[in-house]
Amino acid sequence: MRVLVWIAGLAPLAVAVPSSSYRVAVAARADNTSASVAPSQNVSGAAPPELVVYTLPCEDGNSTARTAEIRLKQATLLYGPSLLGNASYFPGGPLGDAISLRDQTVWEGAAVVQSLRAFTDAAKVAANIKQNGGLNSLDDFKVLYQDGWKGSVPQGIARGQSENYTSDLLFSMERLSVNPYILKRLHPTEDALPFQVDRATVKQLTKTSLKALHAAGRLFVADHSYQRNYTRLANRYSAACTALFYLDPRSNQFLPLAIKTNVGADLTYTPLDTDNNNWLLAKIMFNNNDLFHGQIFHVAYPHAIAEIVHLAALRTMSARHPVLALMERLMYQAYAVRPLGERVLFNKGGLFEQNFAYPQDMVYKFVGDSYPTTGRWRAGYLDTDVRARGLVDADYGPELPHFPFYEDGSRLVEVIRRFVRSFVDATYHESDEMVAKDAELQAWVAEANGPAGVEDFEPGPLDTRERLVEVLTHMAWLTGCAHHVLNQGEPVTASGVLPMHPTALYAPVPTSKANTTADLLGYLPSAQKSVDQVTLLARFNRPDVVPTNQTLRYMFAAPQLLLGNGEAYRRANQRFVRAMGRISDEVKARRFDDRGLSQGMPFIWQALDPGNIPFYLSV
């Protein structure tokens, strides 16, 4: 007597269990373009060979085989050591290894195609730079992007990034868009000032004092001082900047006030340091720290935290469980990124070390140091996070007039939540009691809070539909939204655009403002290294998700989920697709207003366009 257990596209694993006919298929993964279905496509025809009708444990007529399946997974899918630093466990054991290898194969197929595009584009751009006579000024960096990267980055870089690169407003608003995870508002009584700024300078810039701004809840900080003791690679340099921002009481704009380097002479720069382009250099130094933060932060949040919650579910829930099937869809190819990252990106001498200032061990250090905080599940809920940092609904300071990350993100979360609520209500027949009595669901929660070691997970028992809705909504936010704010196409289109966002500095941090060379070219990558930087970041982009309907808009449109979950699921998916389509149309239509601004910024930010970003953890 045998059961054929299909684990998300692997060859069948035949194991001896007490059943002769029970077949399990985790069929929700998008291993090909048919895994997502546009609204116009017919999904009511012939069922796939391994059609699964997803059922709760209490509704399954073959509980013996279901229990045997879970026992098999617990014996062969283990908690292995973390990869890319000390974060969450990574799948181990025979089944864990097989799942990861399967995901790596899928990931590498897309990566090879995208890399070839990037290399082809890079050759054309290098020729353009040669024809220009090199990159001989800051403005020349526009040549790096003009008429280039059309194959690998068809969406182009964010409009305004090249044209307005010297803008202080652009610099400050990037903290509220391209990397919103480092910023916090300083509480007037609970947070001390991170450093002092010359009184006369503050008065000239703000017409008030640092103390008054602090007391009014108008001061914000972005702190990368943790990088001060990081080892740098030979002939690469970086500061460890802490930046102060303020909400101007006159213009109501969010603006930069000062940047402190925290290394060497520990200079503090302000917008009044215009001689020798010192202030521009200070912004470049901060952006260099910030680009490192965004790229490595995203290893822990969302990758590591989403993986461990899903791994706990795999070990405790049947593949026939509708909740696990939904998570399987969200975690498409997820277990490729960390092992491949170790092998080709963060390895000694690998792509990261070829471009960034820090070696592999500093990457691992950042992940290990940050994960106890970034890996907290409930603290990472979108609204919980931004409120904890005083960026939304702070009772000790005025509201930010624009917060593009939250404006876009909260709309997506609400659409996701509406779908998930419909799914949970239909699955549990609108009964909290059924949620509480779902043995596999409760086992998952106990596993996450126990052996899996998930920090700050929902405590058990998980006894209401609404709490389950929040967990699944956050899972979808992590894989289909939060990831793409920091990675995917965002670095090549905004957070890594040169000359303001180099992956490394190529001259030492100044020990005196008088020593800065005004053209700043010595601090920036050479023409070839600039092409290398853009090439690397372009390889993170995934434009093919648009024609294959693997975008966020089609997150829940896997044929097997549509067929295996009933009519209520199909109707909810149709509403989801329409709502995300409307948001996508609005994001694509963004233009500058009569002040040259979009969402209060002098560049157009489209990182959370649900019609353009993957529904999954792509890179």
Swiss-Prot record:
Subcellular location: Secreted
Signal peptide positions on this chain: 1-16
UniProt: Mn(2+) binding residues: H298, H303, H483, N487, V619
Single GO MF descriptor: linoleate 9S-lipoxygenase activity
GO cellular component: extracellular region
Main location, first listed in the record: secreted
Record field: catalytic activity: (9Z,12Z)-octadecadienoate + O2 = (9S)-hydroperoxy-(10E,12Z)-octadecadienoate; (9Z,12Z)-octadecadienoate + O2 = (11S)-hydroperoxy-(9Z,12Z)-octadecadienoate; (9Z,12Z)-octadecadienoate + O2 = (13R)-hydroperoxy-(9Z,11E)-octadecadienoate; (9Z,12Z,15Z)-octadecatrienoate + O2 = (9S)-hydroperoxy-(10E,12Z,15Z)-octadecatrienoate
Entry EC number(s): 1.13.11.-, 1.13.11.45, 1.13.11.58
Entry-linked InterPro entries: LipOase (IPR000907), LipOase_C (IPR013819), LipOase_C_sf (IPR036226)
Free-text remark on how the cofactor is bound: Three His residues, the carboxyl oxygen of the C-terminal Ile or Val residue, and a fifth residue, usually Asn, ligate the metal, which binds water to form a catalytic base Mn(2+)OH(2) for hydrogen abstraction.
GO annotation, biological process: linoleic acid metabolic process; lipid oxidation
Impact upon substituting R539A: Reduces catalytic activity towards alpha-linoleate, but retains oxidation activity on 9S-HPOTrE
Protein family: Belongs to the lipoxygenase family. Manganese lipoxygenase subfamily.
PANTHER family the UniProt entry points to: LIPOXYGENASE
Name of the protein this chain belongs to: Manganese lipoxygenase
Native organism: Pyricularia oryzae (strain 70-15 / ATCC MYA-4617 / FGSC 8958)
